[in-house]
Amino acid sequence: MTTPKLDRRQVLKLEAAAMAALAGGIAMPAAAANLVTERAVSELKWDKAACRFCGTGCSVMVATKENRVVATHGDTKSEVNRGLNCVKGYFLSKIMYGHDRLTQPMLRKTDGKYDKNGEFMPVSWDEAFDIMAEKFKAALKKRGPSGVGMFGSGQWTVWEGYAASKLFKAGFRSNNIDPNARHCMASAVAGFMRTFGIDEPMGCYDDIEAADVFVLWGSNMAEMHPLLWTRVTDRRLSAPHVKVAVLSTFEHRSFDLADLGLVFKPQTDLAILNAIANHIIKTGRVNKDFVAKHTTFKRGQTDIGYGLRPEHPLQKAATGAAKANDATDMSFEDYAAFVADYTIEKASQISGVPAAKIEALAELYADPNTKVTSFWTMGFNQHTRGVWANNLAYNLHLLTGKISEPGNSPFSLTGQPSACGTAREVGTFSHRLPADMVVTNKKHRDIAEKIWKLPEGTIPDKPGYHAVLQSRMLKDGLLNAYWVQVNNNLQAGANANEETYPGFRNPDNFIVVSDAYPSVTALAADLILPTAMWVEKEGAYGNAERRTQFWHQLVSAPGQARSDLWQLMEFAKRFKIEEVWTEELLAKKPEVRGKTMYDVLYRNGQVDKYPSSDIEAGYLNDESKAFGYYVQKGLFEEYASFGRGHGHDLAPFDDYHRERGLRWPVVNGQETRWRFREGSDPYVQQGAGVQFYGFPDGRARIFALPYEPAAEAPDAEFPFWLSTGRVLEHWHSGTMTRRVPELYKAFPEAVCFMHPDDAAELKLRRGDEIKVESRRGFIRTRVETRGRNKPPRGLVFVPWFDEAQLINKVTLDATDPISLQTDYKKCAVRIERVTAS
């Protein structure tokens, strides 16, 4: 195909459009895009990549020159973002070039030897791995597999997470590996599994253009998923009948578009959800045919506790904690009687939301002529009843049959770029294996051991330490060798003073942190490993709509920085298999004696079957250069074998480098947009119409679950609710975005958003320095009574991106007892003026 020739006037016009687009982030005309990427005189090489930030999964075009990323812009060929980027995406080219980028391993030393209390000194990779292997072997000798652990990430690439999970579950025989997605998506996973028997959304982003109503539950899409919000906004403003409802514990930017805004008391969303279900039933709008054919009813266990330490009074008092995930059968009539108690008036009394607003919201769901898409994220998931909240949202769509078709979709949004693709699909959680398999299921372990060529009994049959429990075990000295990758848990983990930091500095423990920058977590470690970022390695992410996206390595990492994948595989060479497997296992597979973990796990005839010559010409691949084969392709194809044939099908590896992502299941080259719906999902049997095939009976579960209060609420001593979260300009702990000058200047430090009347009552003015204090710790910050976030009286909001203000010292480490996900949205604090000393 030839590119049409342009005359000089057209060239100048398009060049101006292209440069304006690159500077301002607007979409480029196709011809202008061609000019930038194909113009013969251009010195820039452009390639596609998935954005490094949130779970939306935008595609960007990346320009490189002289082994450096010099520009990015939105990918006009992407179905997700259609050429646009958010403000963070515009500055992707700068995230790798902070002045304090780590370029060599650093070990704490005194007088030339490792010392837990020593200063960081540069060391070689050999010395770093020597001391690391020594400490891991000592922990294994002392405690067995339970003595070692890893905290991974929803920012791992697919093959990094897969290699890490394999290293621990098959190599070290320890399930003590968990991703930071435990803090963001675990409740969504458990909600999917309980309701549908299979994980991840049934809908896709195409629902946005087909919906009549959007309902946001605990989701500030305007700032956290801004490119999706542009599509919602376009739909709302271009179709007069479309409505937007937003529910939150405080007003934020998403309320600007809302036709119906509901601010409720923390935790009371549970009562509102049940009241809507009751309204649907009482007004005769249940889709009886759909419910009869496709659902069954369950009564969930109640009084399940709050995931605190066993000795905590709330845990001791919880009668249902031991069976938190249990449920019993019930009839529709029993369910209707259960929710009948949740009248709109009662929900109003519990939540503080006017009854008329709750009824208006209920009508949006109940109206059989409206298509409803519900979006939610951390407001639901970071919740001590987060799994219940997910289940109750699905109830509304199942009762009305508004599910698995264009515009009718309950949609859990993800916060990290591969929380779906890596944490969930790969199964890097402490209880999971790839493709929704779990370590507690013998059949699933058998499948994994067969694919991984392991002797029977290699994978432990009990879940390992989840994220919060890892911190507790480190503190208690029961987890002694710990590796953190793509993570900043000292800034992110709740109750950091009491439960996270003590474990890092416990003299019995050895802590390794792989990072690109000296984060709070890295600086508390014993060994820091410098790590490659984003397009400094070949990668793959899976976004919130089941879309898997690949990119090539485009530039080299600085200095001695290496990818997480290289680190995992290279470290495996330090262990003979006899050092990690029992004699019983070795007797079942004697041919592995004398081999290293690397040989057994990564040179097994599958991972190493693709030659480096398969790499597309013109691209770097440092891992394949180091190991002598196409590492990423081998790992991906082995991983993909877990899901092919039972609803998790991934396309062949090479397809993804050609496409802007594909939504699984991908069968016969065709992606799936709407799961469980005949005609869209190849796994639905002919004539079924809808089939929730995650369960053998093909039915989804509708749960009866009550409102239960939060673990901690305001009182006379601590009279305010505290909620935490993100802001548009920064991502998570700010490790990347705070090193981008433009983003740093846009929002340089965290503040405490509070109601002006609360501030006046405390004799505070905007900008005053205050102390935000809970029973666990405090921070100093400044009052903000204006701006984007508008809390109601009695609630304050503090974002967590600022490492100089560790708000996680204040938060409570309560979790959902089913998902084990932390609740960062509610605890009790007091506000005091900081007086000059």
Curated annotation (Swiss-Prot):
SUPFAM superfamilies: ADC-like, Formate dehydrogenase/DMSO reductase, domains 1-3. Its cofactor is [4Fe-4S] cluster; Mo-bis(molybdopterin guanine dinucleotide). Catalytic subunit of the periplasmic nitrate reductase complex NapAB. Receives electrons from NapB and catalyzes the reduction of nitrate to nitrite. Keywords: 4Fe-4S, Electron transport, Iron, Iron-sulfur, Metal-binding, Molybdenum, Nitrate assimilation, Oxidoreductase, Periplasm, Signal, Transport. Residues 44-100 form the 4Fe-4S Mo/W bis-MGD-type domain. One of its GO terms (molecular function) is nitrate reductase (cytochrome) activity. Mo-bis(molybdopterin guanine dinucleotide) binds at residues 88, 155, 180, 184, 217-224, 248-252, 267-269, 378, 382, 488, 514-515, 537, 564, 724-733, 808, 825. It catalyses: 2 Fe(II)-[cytochrome] + nitrate + 2 H(+) = 2 Fe(III)-[cytochrome] + nitrite + H2O. InterPro entries: Asp_de-COase-like_dom_sf, CT_Nitrate-R-NapA-like, MoPterin_dinucl-bd_dom, Mopterin_OxRdtase, Mopterin_OxRdtase_4Fe-4S_dom, MopterinOxRdtase_cofactor_BS, Periplasm_NO3_reductase_lsu, Prok_molybdopt-oxidoreductase. Component of the periplasmic nitrate reductase NapAB complex composed of NapA and NapB. It is an enzyme of class 1 (oxidoreductase). Gene3D superfamilies: 2.40.40.20, 3.30.200.210, 3.40.50.740, Dimethylsulfoxide Reductase, domain 2 (3.40.228.10). It holds the Pfam family Molybdopterin. Its EC number is 1.9.6.1. PANTHER family: PERIPLASMIC NITRATE REDUCTASE, RESPIRATORY NITRATE REDUCTASE. Belongs to the prokaryotic molybdopterin-containing oxidoreductase family. NasA/NapA/NarB subfamily. It comes from the Bacteria. One of its GO terms (cellular component) is periplasmic space. It is found in: Periplasm. GO terms for biological process: cellular respiration; Mo-molybdopterin cofactor biosynthetic process; nitrate assimilation. This is Periplasmic nitrate reductase. Predicted to be exported by the Tat system. The position of the signal peptide cleavage has not been experimentally proven. It comes from Rhodopseudomonas palustris (strain BisB18). Substrate binds at residue 800. [4Fe-4S] cluster binds at residues 51, 54, 58, 86. Binds 1 [4Fe-4S] cluster. Residues 1-33 form the signal peptide.
